[in-house]
């Protein structure tokens, strides 16, 4: 049984299969006891793989889908998102801290992310988000400029920000993968210790 299960959310017009390829080098570098759970966005129209469209059309459907997925089990310990999937990860992190919250997960990793501009979402980011987070941004990113990813990171209380010289990609070099692997290892140890404690409490 894996110590951690991480939900992986693809970018706009991406897919689970595409994200698996994009994450191949990162996946090889992270702890072996982390299970990566790749999913496709709920189809908002025929042949569509976006989480929402212009004007945030489809957001409500995606939100309800994500809440159901995260609540249905087996457990999801954290969320990884790329591009629009990273923006969705930020929104889910904000929903996690609403009260009462429909979501429970322990960390968030966002690559090439940005903050929602939907007026209805402003209240979700009224306070700094406390969920531990990693934010990866490329200084040469022409699709989601680095400043937008840094603005998303600023919504979090204690973000780990990793900058790289490249564009709108999931980097596979050690300068990026090593700190992410270390971040995940911390949660892997925490989860393992928690399960061991739960097991000892259940012994007669």
Predicted regions and their residues:
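Post-His helix in hydrolase/transferase enzymes
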Residues: 172-186
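Serine-hydrolase catalytic machinery in alpha/beta-hydrolase-like enzymes
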Residues: 2-78
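Catalytic histidine neighborhood in serine/cysteine hydrolases
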Residues: 154-171
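Short alpha-helix in the alpha/beta-hydrolase fold that links the catalytic acid
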Residues: 21-24, 122-123, 145-154
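Gly/Ala-rich beta-loop-alpha elbow adjacent to hydrolase catalytic centers
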Residues: 80-89
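Acidic catalytic loop of the alpha/beta-hydrolase fold
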Residues: 116-117, 139-144, 168-169
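Short beta-strand/loop motif that positions the catalytic acidic residue
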Residues: 129, 134-137, 141
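Conserved alpha/beta-hydrolase "acid-adjacent" motif
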Residues: 17, 142-148, 171
């Amino acid at each position: 049984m894996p110590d951690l299960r991480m939900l992986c959310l693809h970018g706009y017009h991406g897919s689970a299969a595409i994200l698996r390829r994009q994450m191949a080098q990162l996946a090889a570098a992270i702890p072996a006891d982390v299970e990566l759970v790749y999913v496709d966005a709920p189809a908002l129209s025929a042949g569509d793989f976006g989480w929402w469209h212009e004007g945030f059309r489809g957001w409500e459907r995606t939100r309800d889908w994500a809440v159901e997925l995260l609540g249905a089990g087996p457990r999801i310990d954290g969320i990884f998102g790329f591009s629009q999937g990273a923006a969705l990860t930020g929104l889910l992190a904000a929903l996690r801290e609403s009260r009462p919250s429909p979501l429970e997960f322990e960390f968030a990793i966002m690559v090439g992310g940005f903050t929602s501009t939907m007026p209805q979402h402003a209240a979700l980011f009224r306070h700094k988000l406390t969920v531990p987070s990693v934010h990866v941004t490329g200084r040469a990113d022409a699709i989601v400029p680095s400043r937008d990813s840094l603005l998303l990171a600023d919504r979090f209380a204690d973000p780990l920000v990793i900058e790289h010289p490249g564009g709108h990609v999931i980097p596979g070099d050690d300068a990026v993968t090593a700190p992410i692997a270390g971040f995940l290892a911390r949660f892997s140890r925490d989860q393992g210790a928690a399960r061991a404690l739960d097991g000892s409490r259940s012994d007669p």
